[in-house]
Amino acid sequence: MHWGVGFASSRPCVVDLSWNQSISFFGWWAGSEEPFSFYGDIIAFPLQDYGGIMAGLGSDPWWKKTLYLTGGALLAAAAYLLHELLVIRKQQEIDSKDAIILHQFARPNNGVPSLSPFCLKMETYLRMADLPYQNYFGGKLSAQGKMPWIEYNHEKVSGTEFIIDFLEEKLGVNLNKNLGPHERAISRAVTKMVEEHFYWTLAYCQWVDNLNETRKMLSLSGGGPFSNLLRWVVCHITKGIVKREMHGHGIGRFSEEEIYMLMEKDMRSLAGLLGDKKYIMGPKLSTLDATVFGHLAQAMWTLPGTRPERLIKGELINLAMYCERIRRKFWPEWHHDDDNTIYESEESSEGSKTHTPLLDFSFYSRTETFEDEGAENSFSRTPDTDFTGHSLFDSDVDMDDYTDHEQCK
């Protein structure tokens, strides 16, 4: 069977798919700073009777060929106009006037909010700061080729560090106001360790060593009957990009065993820094918690059977408890099939074993969401329960939980 492969785009573009070239569309997984160079879809289609079709066209008179070509052109034009109308409609629906629009990748199909540590970091930060926002899963990268990025009052900002600085300036939120100069310096140093070093070891485990499991979690819209093929193409292109970017970073020049040794050192450092504290920097939330959670959650819930998962759920159990604590508090709709009873009491374990898809709120506000849940489900909150009524195994939630959000107002 012959197969045809094409690239469909609604705008002019030039795509070089030679042996030594990579598609920049997938640079987000490797943290690439390259600008997004084209938009569209890779389409594969079977040519079951290739010779017969060509022979049939060749025997037709010229006027029939003209009709075929004209009809094809009209269909292509109609498809193009329909696409542009849908794009315009979407753009009209996401007006960012006085609203935070969070652009990120589509939810994976395993119930985890995102396979990208930075997307999960950014959305968790918005929930920690209690800032209402609207998700947009269009997949379009920012002008800098980054994901996630936000729109607010028609201003566009990319890069999680710059987004947080922007929101602090525009909206007056500050999760770090309880930190002194010395603590802020430690927080920044740990952030750089996590985002510039630990991240690459996770990317290796996720997109190189554990690629088959990651492919099962990846969600692609619009693939139709070729979704599995597209998923395979995306994952293997991403694998090549990750390996290339890791080599440029330097960490990719080491062996697999050495990369995992570096990962374990980073995880042990985080476990030692956390100790028995509620959050990384103490009893109060800070921006660092969104960063650390966004990365540790990948090891906790997206890398089944791997060394980082075994480490975080075994020897470094305080990191697992930390992840569960943040998940339950700021992601009440996120439940997982393999919830482990070691992190909870018998009373709460039964309810948490049921998988519930993540809700894509039109506008998400943590305060409003919990108020609605309280009114509908009549949860009674005690010092041993979180805002969803689940009992917490380590008595993390106490009577001053609501004050965690007051620090950023």
Curated annotation (Swiss-Prot):
Membrane topology: Single-pass membrane protein
Primary location: membrane
Spans through the membrane: 68-88
Location relative to the cell: Membrane
InterPro entries in the cross-refs: FAX/IsoI-like, FAXC_N, Glutathione-S-Trfase_C_sf, Metaxin_GST, Mito_Protein_Transport_Metaxin, Thioredoxin-like_fold, Thioredoxin-like_sf
Region (Disordered) location: 372-409
Top-level division of the source organism's lineage: Eukaryota
PANTHER family: FAILED AXON CONNECTIONS HOMOLOG, METAXIN RELATED
Identification of the protein by name: Failed axon connections homolog
Upper classification of the organism: Eukaryota, Metazoa, Chordata, Craniata, Vertebrata
